[in-house]
Amino acid sequence: MRQSLTLIPTLREVPADAEAKSHQLLLRAGFIRQNTSGVYSYMPLAYKVIQNIQQIVREEMEKIDAVEMLMPALQQAETWQESGRWYTYGPELMRLKDRHGREFALGATHEEVITSLVRDEVKSYKRLPLTLYQIQSKFRDEKRPRFGLLRGREFIMKDAYSFHASAESLDETYQKMYEAYSNIFARCGINVRPVIADSGAMGGKDTHEFMALSAIGEDTIAYSDESQYAANIEMAEVLHQEVPSDEEPKALEKVHTPNVKTIEELTAFLQVSAEACIKSVLFKADDRFVLVLVRGDHEVNDIKVKNLLHAEVVELATHEEVIQQLGTEPGFVGPVGIHQDVEVYADQAVKAMVNAVAGANEGDHHYKNVNVNRDAQIKEFADLRFIKEGDPSPDGKGTIRFAEGIEVGQVFKLGTRYSEAMNATYLDENGRAQPMLMGCYGIGVSRTLSAIAEQHHDEKGLIWPKSVAPYDLHILALNMKNDGQRELAEKLYADLKAEGYEVLYDDRAERAGVKFADSDLIGLPIRITVGKRADEGIVEVKIRQTGESTEISVDELSAFISKQ
């Protein structure tokens, strides 16, 4: 492609509202342009990268017998109502009405559509297993779109769905998809770590996220420094090691703590450690209230609370709800004397606490010498806190460390979450109707583009891996007015294209400095510069990844490039 005939609007200045390096560089290099908040146009270079990522996806999907199709982005409300998610998905689901007042959603995901489709078309176990996938734009009304393509309101996604007659079949496809995803990201050149994750609004149980390691990642990964264990911090189990105390329980004592509401204030006022305090947090779980206790130096993990209670929605109680339910303000809440309408759940570390400090459910007062087994009615002890750096790894090997990551893919075992709700059944060998077992597998294609840019750049610009680069080669003719340079550049352009290379040819009437700067910014794997030695048949070849430059005869150019 001649650069004079395409659209690559590079920028010299960093856009003021671009936080992430990938966002800055994709804008500066002319890959994307913002239409509105969280919505972008993919310029010619970006779209070629997207197509290369999609081709890798298609090749890996074909290897595991997944079949491509395309479903509608506009989805009727009735289908979502069947699954129940119309009422629980939240404001991220973009809803609209047609001229007749009928309700629709713009597809944030396609479980409902694919389940209803397969329900109507597949009736026998003989047609299972079946894996279908699509690559399509998705829509989510993000509260705060940011980081360019990493968190947008419209994005390109590959989503696959598998249907099975047995758990063994689902497990087999899940493992194949897991390996295919690992291959996809490796081929795209991304440093990705698969981690144990939460299924969230998707439902189901077993799930893994593929996290591209990045300092600007919005997810925290907890990993072992001595093993392969890795999990999203929301799902990382805490390996509880109870240490018996030889301290004798003391009598409960109420103390005056004027305006002392936080753990930090409490430890300073009473001269105790955070480990000796009980943090009590009131949650609303669907239509009931529960009190959750953790040690003062720990934080409540609301995902673990949600999973323990099998709740659809778990939210912190409001200031008014705390007063209404417990008769006191936040900051003085505790487990002693809670009425039976509010169930109390405690983290496993609380069970071993002796003579702890906790709120007295009375303004400006706390209790000392709280022993929950004696003084409170605990419904259940469980792992309810976030893991911390320095905790032992849940697999018993090594210590937990943290890293930041960008989620670029996720695989789920949905089980019968959707098939039972939507009556998607098949007839088994005995002619009995059974709910289909389902798997769901997603890759953020546009997010993957951004993650590659986030991991592959330097101070001069982008550095695209060869597998996804928009072009293989970048030819620069430094002086288009010089007949020798122009003619040699034209010949190389034609010859290298004929050899099967994707070539971007900078034939613009620009200064050499502009061409070099744009070339580094765009970041194609190999640059061929036709300059002052063109009459000698000598060109400069620069490898973008290493920065190494070599002057070489055009007769040896093809052989040299093929080895890179």
UniProtKB/Swiss-Prot annotation:
Q: Enumerate the SUPFAM superfamilies for this protein.
A: Class II aaRS ABD-related, Class II aaRS and biotin synthetases, YbaK/ProRS associated domain
**EC number, UniProt record:** 6.1.1.15
Q: Which UniProt keywords apply?
A: Aminoacyl-tRNA synthetase, ATP-binding, Cytoplasm, Ligase, Nucleotide-binding, Protein biosynthesis
What's the domain of life for this entry? Bacteria
Q: Which InterPro entries match?
A: aa-tRNA-synt_IIb (IPR002314), aa-tRNA-synth_II (IPR006195), aa-tRNA-synth_II/BPL/LPL (IPR045864), Anticodon-bd (IPR004154), Anticodon-bd_dom_sf (IPR036621), Pro-tRNA-ligase_IIa (IPR002316), Pro-tRNA-synth_IIa_bac-type (IPR004500), Pro-tRNA-Synthase_IIa_type1 (IPR023717)
Which reactions fall under this protein's catalytic activity?
A: tRNA(Pro) + L-proline + ATP = L-prolyl-tRNA(Pro) + AMP + diphosphate
Q: Which Pfam families match?
A: HGTP_anticodon, tRNA-synt_2b, tRNA_edit
Transferase among keywords: no
CC per GO annotation: cytosol
Its function? Answer: Catalyzes the attachment of proline to tRNA(Pro) in a two-step reaction: proline is first activated by ATP to form Pro-AMP and then transferred to the acceptor end of tRNA(Pro). As ProRS can inadvertently accommodate and process non-cognate amino acids such as alanine and cysteine, to avoid such errors it has two additional distinct editing activities against alanine. One activity is designated as 'pretransfer' editing and involves the tRNA(Pro)-independent hydrolysis of activated Ala-AMP.
Q: Which family does it belong to?
A: Belongs to the class-II aminoacyl-tRNA synthetase family. ProS type 1 subfamily.
What does the subunit section of this Swiss-Prot or TrEMBL entry state? Homodimer.
Q: What is known of its domains?
A: Consists of three domains: the N-terminal catalytic domain, the editing domain and the C-terminal anticodon-binding domain.
What's the protein here called? Proline--tRNA ligase
Q: What species is this protein from?
A: Bacillus subtilis (strain 168)
Q: What is the gene called?
A: proS
